[in-house]
């Protein structure tokens, strides 16, 4: 039967997930522990019964547990008074005990203590025992008492609450038996059970409290008398009433008693026991207890409860403390007890029993300030600040608290003694029930609904009989049903109660079925709850019962007046119930335990809530209301349902975090790869260059988006089902409390001088290590936060989508309040969700259109896009930034774990102010060379071929050769010096290599020489871009074809994950990439083509993942498996339903393939750091762009390897977003190579010969940026072919630069700049170059560089499909093209355009010619630009755009004369062949120029059809501003 709402709230077992405090450890219990003895006799020589650790209270009551010191009075009655009427006999006993209860009780206490001394019990300090069940489980391990040993009772000295004492069950049992014998109600309640037990709630409750629970509480007071009030701290007082105090019911095993708030005094409350069984006639001290400012309320531990309780509130008292030091005896007559007298006890720990839901009332004030309530004969009290507020002639509406009703005795009484019980109770003063309290009110208005609450409480009760029919319908319609074994018993994995991790498919079906009944509840009928000005922490939490119908939802979006929730489990809605996909929380939503206030402003993004009731949102109130619709039509913007009742499950424990602010107000958190939101009123109050410590909420990230209980073999099929439903990323964490961290900020100031003994002489080694870790970890987290690129966890609806090949163009909103501009950038990884599931992609261009308030985005889709995925048809598509999975590389303590002598630690110490590392020079005459090489590389011999005769390598370095055909190429002396330094075993060397100096060839040569020394040691070659790594692969492939016998077994691979590989453009993929080689290798392994004797290192989990990968990618039919693989498949096939684990697959691949050289980008290197072992050398290309955090990760993982950094400090430093600045940027991104060269930290060699550019270009750049140190390695003739062949285009063929003056104005686009006239000029030039009938240029040989990201996006769209690469200056570092078109865009030359390193990169990309488009007057006045412009003008290559246009049109090579790009693949190939045959020497590089980027033919790029772009936006949808 479906439980009603009231039953749910009454039966629910709340739990406390609040952060622990020191109050929770206060269990001040005295402990009597018996000395060890071999005897098992008690003090009377009788055997002591063994105590079962699992014995229950019922067993204790029947005598199984505990020892009795006196015979039960019933024994004598049964022998001496057997003929007496039972009622008369009991009456006689009760009267005699009642008359002498006080003296008898005190005598019993004295007798008891004497007996305890005889038993030899002692009080000792022991670990805390916090519950009844805890000391029960301990009791079986206690030694038996010895009748021969005696000792005094030593009272434990309680010095502080933090030193609790433990409970000895034997002493407790003795006290309990004494209380049982003295309590007048014992005979009246013994041996009976509570009626209708099955209908009672779980946990301690007023209606299931029993007589033996009262005995436990009274007995426990003898232990609690050691607690002293002066040892408890006073708690701070909150000024305003907190209505929604956390409430719950204590567990069954907890010793407690129920008390009611009877009186309110100035600084305390007086409580009266709810059940007279607790005190009887003999324990008047337990009749009244007080609550004061030392009382701890569960869930409200940090504040005093004074001022927050109502008269009539029920409190569960779980611990007592003596109020007065003079109290020496716990016993007193109940006749002496009075609420006006000082209480002997205070309630030191209490739990608020769940209150009734607030009641809406209509009333008028009486003359004495009370309330006369409509339709009620009983007055109510009103909380008034001033009696003058009460206007007797005005009607008011308000919210009232009504106290609970209960019987004054427990329910386990003997039925025949009921009248006797009532007679005895009449001798005890019983206080009447407290009046209800109106705590919030306002003047009456006709719109206020007073009696609606009762009417709307259960409007669906009559429809519950149809629930089974709805449930059956949902079960049959839900697409997930077939994957779950519904008939099988679905026992929850993690105990009673529902949670997000143990929810079952049947629970989802019940919730969906119940929605047909909840449709009768409407939002307009629910009252709006008042909103609190500040967030309440902690909120009350609880777990829904097993019998409660609910579903779990996650907070996805936060608005000012509502939250949007998304279902955690897709079983709830399947494909057919799109109305249940998103729900709304608004001001009418009730949170369990927080019913009196609105929950708006109290939840975090990412919070998980259990929805226990729905209501139809306003706007969906039609009687013709139809619930189901396809999930693809669901939208977070228009919710069908609101969550009218919710429960907050236990939140994750608050996390302590160290963080710094970024410019965008988000936080970089130490140890995290993603930013966090910060609750801060004003960003002006914080500084970005400081470290703060705070408390954060980290949302729970469920592993599955469907429920438990699925059929394991069908898990992969369920995953396929869920992929067809759009997913949303998890939310960022939220920091809600913080302050400056003084110690960490001191470390921050010392920073890179941590190991400087000159600047800081008194710092200990331990503190130096902490400084390094603090700075490096904060920087590491900052850099990862920036590089991961997810700064927006929102999902946006895609407007007017257009797909062309693997590129999709769409628009998303750019709201003014929370703009997307700046958070959505080129390079962001995205996920697009729609009716057919999800597909991944990467943003290529972002263009702001302020007129309509949208961003225009073009993204490249992943190649693993499902075949059926389409943007056509019904349904909406949403896009969000893809979530990044954290991959911790640096963690707390990483630096301390490094061996003091390893290369990694030595390098880090040098980077942080330690002594420079001197160059290691190997003397070839030294007989120890073999030993050194053996230590460094595991080499026994082989260095002799590099020996020189009698001189050190730094004077005459060995000549090295690069393998090539037909003859090896000799490296120049600077390149040889670099190779020799790496071979000499230096921990770290730096190769300062200007543009075009052949550094790629130098890196490969050094790697090959190391390979010859020892072939079973891996080497890592790291680049900064995929294009550069492809270049290294290209060079390595040519090396293998050189015919060198020493290299015939060389194996290399480019490491790239399968997911990233699917998103790479075609010209960035090779057949040496790991995904390609992995599929080939695993296929050979599966078919038995690989010798298995060499694969003993593989473990079972490797085999399982390999077979899963083969099946998932359909590489081999299982029928064709080799014998050994077939056995594995047959034995382990049950595990193959799971998706393959990527890291395990990579491990298996490297174990089988065993590559010698591994090429990888710096970003992808993280995936290798925990996999590769035995790496002897790491070389890093374009090292000037290497972020310091990446280098630190490499140094930590490969701490025994030698490192070679080769790059140019006169080019761009490591890339960093504008959001990162100050110390976060210095420690995370840094400029390691420049700092190392300037401060002479490591050995350096400088390459000087330039083989890329035209000699005059090299000469000009050498004078501008290198102090004239560069030497050209090529002739002018080799770089002048284009100029000489296109004299119609190029004014002066003897100078390789041309300037086109553009007078068109630029336009601001967000924080960037664009220029439409410049775009047109670029289009004209590109058309001219690639459409020339005599000398057409291959589009892949043209590069367009812009200094502004907005202009880059516009140019990319303008030239899309042409095969011409467009990019920023940063994107072009490491690349080269025959022809470069450089766009300055802005007529106002900004500071960053005048940076020497940026201009150096832009001007050094061209092998033949550079065409500059810019504003002449502006550039004449700019640094460096003025020199370049003057040189061009002196050589006659300065033209005006309009004049140049006219000249080209006279020569008939304009846009109107020739088609843009031929749509015929054959004619295009013919023109390319003709061009290549006529310009062979232009394509061929000089003999020593193997470091260039390989050309990519235009046939690899998608066909361009139609016009260029209709002024860029022609293919874009026209979005109206009203959208």
Swiss-Prot record:
Keyword Nucleotide-binding: yes
Skewed-composition ranges (Polar residues): 1463-1476, 1485-1498
Binding site for ATP: 993-1000
GO molecular function: ATP binding; helicase activity; hydrolase activity; RNA binding; transcription termination site sequence-specific DNA binding
Gene Ontology cellular component annotations, sorted alphabetically: nuclear body
GO biological process entries: termination of RNA polymerase II transcription
Entry keyword ATP-binding: yes
InterPro entries linked to this entry: Coronavir_polyprotein_1ab (IPR050534), DNA2/NAM7-like_C (IPR041679), DNA2/NAM7_AAA_11 (IPR041677), P-loop_NTPase (IPR027417), SF1_C_Upf1 (IPR047187)
This enzyme's EC code(s): 3.6.4.-
Pfam families per the UniProt record, alphabetical: AAA_11, AAA_12
Region named Disordered: 1-89, 1463-1498
Keywords: ATP-binding, Helicase, Hydrolase, Nucleotide-binding
Coiled coil spans: none
Family membership: Belongs to the DNA2/NAM7 helicase family.
PANTHER family: DNA2/NAM7 HELICASE FAMILY MEMBER, HELICASE WITH ZINC FINGER 2
Name of this protein: Uncharacterized ATP-dependent helicase C05C10.2
């Amino acid at each position: 039967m479906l439980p009603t709402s009231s039953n749910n709230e009454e039966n629910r077992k709340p739990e406390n997930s609040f952060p622990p405090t020191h109050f929770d450890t206060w269990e001040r219990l005295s402990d009597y522990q018996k000395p060890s003895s071999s005897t098992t006799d008690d003090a009377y020589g009788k055997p002591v019964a063994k105590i079962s650790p699992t014995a229950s209270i019922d067993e204790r009551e029947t005598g199984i547990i505990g020892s009795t010191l006196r015979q039960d009075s019933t024994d004598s009655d049964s022998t001496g008074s057997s003929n007496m009427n039972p009622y008369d006999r009991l009456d006689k006993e009760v009267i005699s005990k009642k008359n002498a209860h006080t003296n008898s009780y005190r005598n019993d206490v004295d007798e008891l203590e004497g007996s305890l001394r005889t038993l030899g019990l002692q009080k000792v300090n022991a670990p805390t025992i916090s519950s009844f069940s805890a000391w029960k489980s301990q009791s079986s391990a206690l030694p038996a008492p010895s009748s021969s040993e005696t000792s005094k009772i030593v009272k434990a000295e309680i010095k502080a609450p933090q030193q609790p004492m433990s409970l000895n069950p034997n002493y407790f049992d003795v006290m309990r038996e004494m209380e049982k014998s003295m309590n007048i109600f014992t005979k009246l309640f013994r041996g009976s059970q509570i009626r209708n037990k099955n209908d009672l709630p779980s946990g301690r409750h007023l209606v299931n409290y029993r007589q033996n629970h009262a005995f436990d509480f009274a007995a426990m007071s003898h232990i609690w008398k050691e607690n002293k009030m002066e040892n408890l701290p006073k708690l701070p007082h909150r000024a305003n009433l907190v209505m929604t105090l956390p409430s719950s019911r204590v567990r069954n095993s907890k010793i407690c008693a129920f008390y009611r708030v009877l009186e309110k005094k100035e600084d305390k409350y007086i409580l009266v026991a709810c059940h007279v069984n607790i005190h009887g006639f003999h324990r008047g001290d337990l009749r009244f207890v007080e609550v004061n400012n030392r009382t701890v309320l569960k869930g409200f531990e940090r504040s005093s409860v004074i001022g927050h309780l109502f008269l009539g509130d029920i409190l569960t008292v779980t611990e007592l403390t003596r109020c007065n030091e003079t109290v020496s005896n716990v016993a007193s007559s109940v006749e002496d007890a009075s609420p006006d007298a000082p209480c002997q006890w205070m309630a030191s720990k209490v739990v608020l029993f769940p209150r009734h839901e607030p009641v809406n009332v209509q009333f008028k004030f009486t003359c004495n300030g009370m309330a006369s309530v409509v339709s009620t004969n009983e007055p109510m009290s009103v909380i008034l600040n001033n009696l003058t507020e009460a206007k007797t002639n005005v009607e008011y509406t308000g919210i009232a608290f009504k106290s609970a009703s209960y019987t004054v005795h427990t329910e386990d009484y003997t039925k025949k003694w009921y009248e006797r019980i009532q007679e005895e109770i009449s001798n005890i003063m019983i206080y009447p029930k407290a009046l209800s309290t109106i705590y919030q009110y306002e003047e009456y208005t006709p719109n206020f609904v007073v009696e609606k609450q009762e009417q709307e409480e259960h409007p669906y009760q009559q429809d519950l009989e149809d629930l089974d029919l709805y449930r059956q319908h949902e079960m049959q319609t839900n697409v997930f049903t077939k994957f779950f074994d519904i008939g099988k018993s679905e026992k929850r994995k993690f105990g009673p109660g529902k949670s997000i991790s143990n929810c079952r498919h049947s629970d989802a079906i019940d919730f969906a079925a119940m929605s047909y009944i909840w449709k009768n509840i409407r939002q307009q009928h629910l009252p709006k709850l008042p909103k609190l000005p500040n967030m309440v922490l902690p909120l009350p939490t609880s777990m829904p019962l097993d019998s409660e119908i609910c579903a779990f939802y996650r907070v996805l979006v936060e608005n000012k007046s509502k939250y949007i929730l998304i279902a955690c489990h897709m079983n709830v809605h399947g494909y057919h119930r799109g109305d249940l996909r998103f729900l709304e929380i608004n001001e009418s939503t009730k949170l369990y335990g927080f019913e009196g206030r609105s929950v708006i402003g109290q939840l975090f993004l990412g919070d998980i809530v259990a929805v226990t009731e729905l209501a139809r949102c306003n706007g969906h109130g039609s009687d013709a209301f139809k619930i189901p619709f396809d999930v693809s039509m669901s939208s977070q913007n228009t919710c069908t349902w609101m969550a009218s009742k919710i429960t907050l499950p236990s939140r994750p424990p608050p996390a302590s975090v160290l963080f710094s602010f970024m410019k965008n107000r988000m936080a970089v958190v130490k140890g995290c790869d993603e930013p966090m939101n910060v609750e801060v009123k004003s960003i002006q109050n914080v500084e970005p260059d400081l470290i703060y410590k705070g408390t954060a909420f980290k949302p729970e990230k469920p592993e599955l988006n469907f429920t438990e209980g699925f059929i394991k073999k069908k898990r992969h099929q369920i995953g396929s089902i869920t992929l067809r439903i759009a997913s949303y990323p998890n939310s960022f964490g939220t920091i809600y409390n913080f302050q400056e961290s003084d110690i960490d900020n001191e470390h921050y100031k010392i920073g890179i001088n941590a190991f400087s003994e000159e600047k800081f002489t008194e710092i200990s080694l331990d503190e130096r290590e902490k400084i390094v870790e603090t700075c490096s970890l904060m920087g590491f987290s900052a850099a990862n936060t920036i590089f991961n690129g997810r700064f927006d966890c929102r999902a946006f609806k895609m407007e007017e989508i257009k797909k062309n090949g693997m590129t999709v163009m769409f628009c998303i909103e750019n709201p003014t309040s929370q703009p997307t501009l700046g958070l959505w950038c080129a390079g962001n990884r995205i996920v697009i969700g729609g009716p057919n599931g999800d597909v991944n992609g990467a943003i290529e261009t972002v263009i702001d259109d302020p007129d309509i308030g949208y961003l225009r985005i073009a993204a490249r889709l992943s190649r693993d896009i499902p075949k059926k995925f389409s943007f056509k048809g019904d349904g909406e598509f949403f896009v969000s930034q893809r979530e990044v999975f954290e991959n911790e590389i640096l963690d707390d303590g990483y630096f301390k774990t490094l061996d003091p002598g390893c290369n990694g630690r030595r390098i880090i110490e040098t980077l942080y102010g330690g002594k420079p590392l001197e160059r290691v020079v190997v003397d070839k005459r030294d007989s120890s060379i073999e030993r050194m090489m053996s230590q460094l590389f595991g080499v026994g011999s082989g260095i002799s071929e590099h020996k020189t005769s009698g001189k050190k390598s730094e004077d005459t370095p060995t000549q090295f050769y690069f393998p090539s055909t037909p003859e090896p190429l000799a490296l120049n002396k600077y390149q040889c010096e670099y190779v020799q330094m790496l071979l000499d075993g230096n921990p770290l060397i730096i190769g300062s290599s200007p543009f075009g100096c052949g550094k790629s060839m130098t890196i490969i040569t050094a790697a090959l020489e190391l390979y010859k020394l020892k072939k079973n040691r891996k080497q890592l070659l790291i680049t900064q871009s995929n294009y550069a790594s492809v270049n290294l692969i290209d060079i390595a492939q040519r090396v293998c074809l050189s015919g060198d016998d020493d290299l015939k077994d060389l194996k290399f691979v480019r490491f790239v994950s399968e997911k990233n590989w699917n998103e790479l453009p075609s010209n960035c993929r090779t057949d040496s990439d790991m995904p390609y080689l992995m599929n080939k290798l695993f296929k050979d392994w599966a078919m038995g083509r690989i010798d298995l004797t060499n694969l003993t290192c593989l473990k079972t989990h490797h085999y399982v993942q390999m077979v899963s990968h083969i099946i998932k990618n359909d590489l081999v039919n299982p029928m064709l498996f080799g014998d050994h693989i077939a056995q594995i498949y047959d034995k382990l096939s049950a595990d193959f339903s799971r998706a393959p684990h990527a890291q395990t697959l990579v491990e298996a691949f490297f174990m089988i393939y065993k590559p010698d050289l591994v090429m990888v980008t710096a970003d992808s290197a993280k995936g290798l750091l925990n996999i590769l072992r035995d790496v002897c050398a790491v070389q890093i290309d374009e090292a000037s762009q290497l972020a310091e955090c990446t280098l630190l990760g490499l140094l930590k993982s490969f701490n025994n390897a030698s490192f070679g950094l080769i790059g140019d400090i006169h080019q761009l430093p490591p890339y960093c977003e504008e959001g990162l600045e100050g110390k976060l940027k210095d420690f995370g991104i840094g400029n390691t190579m420049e700092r190392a060269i300037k401060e002479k930290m490591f050995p350096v060699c400088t390459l000087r010969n330039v083989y890329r550019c035209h000699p005059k270009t090299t000469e000009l750049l050498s004078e501008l940026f290198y102090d004239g140190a560069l030497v050209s390695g090529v002739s002018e003739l080799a770089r002048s072919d284009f100029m000489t062949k296109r004299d119609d285009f190029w004014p002066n063929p003897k100078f390789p630069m041309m300037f086109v003056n553009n007078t068109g104005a630029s336009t601001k686009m967000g924080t960037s700049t664009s220029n439409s006239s410049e775009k047109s000029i670029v289009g004209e030039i590109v058309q001219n170059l690639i459409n020339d009938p005599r000398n057409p240029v291959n589009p892949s040989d043209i590069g367009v560089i812009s200094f502004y990201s907005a202009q880059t996006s516009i140019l990319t769209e303008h030239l899309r499909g042409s095969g011409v690469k467009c990019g920023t200056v940063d994107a072009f570092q490491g690349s080269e093209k025959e022809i470069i078109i450089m766009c300055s865009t802005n007529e106002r030359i900004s500071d960053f355009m005048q940076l020497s390193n940026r201009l150096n990169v832009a001007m050094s990309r061209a092998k033949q010619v550079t065409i500059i488009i810019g504003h002449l007057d502006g550039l004449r006045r700019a640094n460096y630009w003025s020199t370049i412009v003057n040189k061009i003008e002196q050589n006659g290559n300065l033209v005006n755009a309009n004049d140049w246009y006219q000249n080209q049109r006279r020569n008939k090579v304009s846009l109107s004369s020739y088609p843009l790009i031929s749509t015929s693949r054959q004619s295009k190939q013919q023109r390319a062949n003709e061009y290549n045959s006529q310009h062979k020497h232009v394509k061929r590089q000089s003999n020593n120029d193997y470091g260039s980027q390989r050309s990519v033919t235009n046939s690899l790029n998608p066909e361009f059809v139609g016009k260029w772009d209709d002024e860029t936006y022609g293919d874009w949808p026209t979005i109206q501003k009203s959208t």
